[in-house]
Swiss-Prot record:
Family: Belongs to the R-transferase family. Bpt subfamily.
Function: Functions in the N-end rule pathway of protein degradation where it conjugates Leu from its aminoacyl-tRNA to the N-termini of proteins containing an N-terminal aspartate or glutamate.
Record keywords, A-Z: Acyltransferase, Cytoplasm, Transferase
EC number: 2.3.2.29
InterPro entries: Acyl_CoA_acyltransferase, Asp_Glu_LeuTrfase, N-end_Aminoacyl_Trfase, N-end_Aminoacyl_Trfase_C, N-end_Aminoacyl_Trfase_N
Pfam annotation, one family: ATE_N
Organism, scientific name: Leptothrix cholodnii (strain ATCC 51168 / LMG 8142 / SP-6)
Catalysis: reaction(s): N-terminal L-glutamyl-[protein] + L-leucyl-tRNA(Leu) = N-terminal L-leucyl-L-glutamyl-[protein] + tRNA(Leu) + H(+); N-terminal L-aspartyl-[protein] + L-leucyl-tRNA(Leu) = N-terminal L-leucyl-L-aspartyl-[protein] + tRNA(Leu) + H(+)
Recorded GO MF terms: arginyl-tRNA--protein transferase activity; leucyl-tRNA--protein transferase activity
Localization terms from the record: Cytoplasm
Root EC class: transferase
Official protein name in the record: Aspartate/glutamate leucyltransferase
GO cellular component, as recorded: cytoplasm
GO biological process: ubiquitin-dependent protein catabolic process via the N-end rule pathway
Length: 247
């Protein structure tokens, strides 16, 4: 794992949190290494942090720092080499009618309602299904880096907007896009999550950026293991990004 002192981040300080219950693996305790102060973490600095395995949650920039556990593995997709599977191509084709709108970070009641539906159906009992407006805003709508909100809708009729299907938060980095969080209409048959990752890959290509950073892959967590289905991909192992063989 890259040490923070090896990064051009001399003004930042890093501290380890106290242990807390792991969100992904039952009966495990987790710790995080946090980069501070947050007001010094601009788009340039954050790009270096993401390349070193950090992620962002609101103003909170962190990476796993767990005792005796290295299950969280940063994963990124080299977008120009991406080769979709048959099921991924099917999901892409299924939702070609969706219309993407790139927006600044802002609170939209319809987005928040979709977020709560998604959490209640996909992650019920995890705590986020009861997030208040303030918690939602702090988690997704606060940023000091180059962030975008993208909403995906069905085609509208006249002046009426179409049905909202997906909302995604992205950070634009020096060398790629970073997928912060995505939520969508919780219909398992629709493969909205797969479609959205493929849209992000296509968007990175369009912007001339080589990578899509998907966050942490956790093999033992169904919520996180899907990321390795996007191939080829690279994982940050021992401080070096390494291309992984096809599974």
């Amino acid at each position: 794992m890259t040490h923070p002192k090896e990064l051009p981040l001399a003004q930042l300080q890093f501290y380890a949190t106290a242990p807390y219950p792991c969100s992904y693996l039952a009966d495990r305790m987790a710790r995080s290494q946090v980069a501070t102060p947050s007001h010094l973490i601009n788009a340039e600095t954050y790009s270096g942090l993401v390349a070193a395995g950090f992620r962002r949650s609101g103003m909170f920039t962190y990476r796993p720092y767990c005792d005796g556990c290295q299950c969280c593995v940063p994963l990124r997709v080299p977008v120009n080499d991406f080769a979709p599977s048959r099921s991924q191509r099917r999901a892409w084709k299924q939702h070609q009618g969706l219309q993407a709108r790139v927006m600044r970070l802002c609170f939209v009641p319809e987005h928040y309602a979709l977020y709560l539906r998604y959490q209640n159906r996909r992650h019920a009992g995890g705590g986020m299904d009861e997030d208040s407006v303030d918690q939602y805003t702090q988690f997704l709508l606060q940023s000091r880096v180059n962030s975008r909100l993208v909403e995906f809708r069905e085609p509208g009729i006249g002046d009426q907007p179409g049905a909202l299907r997906i909302v995604s938060i992205l950070d634009v980095l020096n060398d790629g896009l970073s997928a912060v969080y995505t939520f969508y209409e919780p219909d398992p048959a629709c493969s909205y999550g797969t479609y959205n990752v493929m849209w992000q890959i296509a968007q990175a290509r369009e912007l001339g950026l080589p990578y899509l950073y998907l966050g942490y892959w956790i093999e033992a967590s169904a919520k996180m293991a899907y990321k390795s289905l996007f191939q080829p991909h690279e994982m940050l192992l021992g401080g070096t990004w390494q291309r992984q063989p096809a599974r």
